[in-house]
Amino acid sequence: YKWNSHAVKKKFGDYSFSLGLVWTPSERHMVKANVGRSFRLPGANELAANGVHHGTFRHEQGDTNLKSEQGWQMDASYNLRYNGFSISVSPFVSWFSNYIFLRPTGEWSVLPHAGQIYRYTGAEALFAGTEATIDIHFLRSFNYRISGEYVYTYNCDEHIPLSFSPPFSMRNTLTWQRKQVMLYAEWQSIARQNRVDRNEDRTP
């Protein structure tokens, strides 16, 4: 019998902290800022997986040499509310000295219909992006919301994007509400993603 995984004994130690600031210059404006350091222990699957993940039906392999994930985060937000109109903008940036992620290897699995092998690995990585939302309340019972989000990822070790990077997306929502009755229509737009890892397909 061939074992797919072996016993792993690991010890991890690290620290995390966060600091935040809220400034309200008036009742219409609010500014927030946060900075922090985080760490995450690799999960059992990231350390010892070796087989088909039946949720995604791909062959995933762990790495017993993975160290804890370590990173620094900074984010801010600005909120404005004025006569039925509100806007919120939240930029952020994160830098990881050891970001743990799953990436395609280009090596084909010997397991039937499993495709290429995806392996957990660690790398220096950068994330940056923003989220924005605009709300407009009109005609007493209607509200229109448009929101968008964008995330930029970068593998600093290999100077390429990280795998599974989400594309830019927007969501439009029109809501009608009166007393306890509410109706809404929603439309979501998702852009192409051409910033992909090696051995990863672009999304149309």
Regions found by a protein language model. Give the residues of each.
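Hydrophobic, lipid-facing positions within transmembrane beta-strands of outer-membrane proteins
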Residues: Y15-L19, G62, W72-A76, I87, ...
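Structural signature of outer-membrane beta-barrel channels/translocons
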Residues: V22-R28, E69, N79-N83, D135-N143, ...
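Residue-level detector of the transmembrane beta-barrel scaffold of outer-membrane proteins
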Residues: S18, V22, M30-K32, N45-L47, ...
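Gram-negative outer-membrane beta-barrel transporters
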Residues: F92-F96, S109, H113-D197
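Surface-exposed extracellular loop regions of Gram-negative outer-membrane beta-barrel proteins
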Residues: Y1-K9, F12-W23, E27-Q73, S86, I134-H137, S141-Y150, ...
